[in-house]
Design a protein with these regions (language model features):
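Mg2+-dependent endonuclease catalytic cores in nucleic-acid-processing enzymes, primarily RNase H-like
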Residues: 1-108, 129
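Histidine-centered active-site/metal-ligand motif
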Residues: 114
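Acidic two-metal-ion nuclease catalytic site recognized across multiple nuclease folds
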Residues: 124-134
């Protein structure tokens, strides 16, 4: 698979943010990104003068726990749109690798999980806003 360079990703991200802001008549308030994606942050800042908000990863089990907390409380809603079908499908199929379940650091199966990872970063970056206490 072709991985886009930061110069292309920056333009795509900017276009996506503007498209959603226009559609929902709401500006983006916090642009969360994996702290390991420094090159994209640098490119986005160079192109648009805006830094993305970098979030440090926790252990996968702790990232997932935060998402499960929000969902279990019935505090997560999504728009039932064509574009969101991939989000639901990926979360339905998200699962632990059985070979690692009894280890100190269980792993998930890393297939078709982009929206799962993104949602974990969103929740992690907005713990205070979401009223989570860890």
């Amino acid at each position: 698979a072709h991985k886009k360079p930061p110069s292309e990703l920056s333009k795509d991200l900017y276009s996506f943010i503007n498209k959603l802001a226009k559609k929902f008549k709401k500006p983006a308030t916090k642009l969360t990104i994996d702290s390991a994606e420094g090159a994209l942050d640098n490119q986005f800042y160079n192109d648009y003068g805006v830094h993305l908000h970098k979030v440090a990863k926790l252990k996968k089990v702790d990232m997932i726990d935060r998402v499960q907390n929000i969902v279990a409380q019935g505090r997560f809603y999504y728009l039932d749109t064509e574009a969101n079908k991939i989000f639901i499908e990926e979360h339905r199929n998200y699962r632990w690798d059985e070979k690692t379940l009894n280890s100190d650091d269980p792993k998930v199966i890393k297939e078709e999980d982009h929206t799962c990872d993104q949602f974990q970063y969103f929740v992690r970056d907005n713990e205070r806003l979401l009223g989570l206490r860890y």
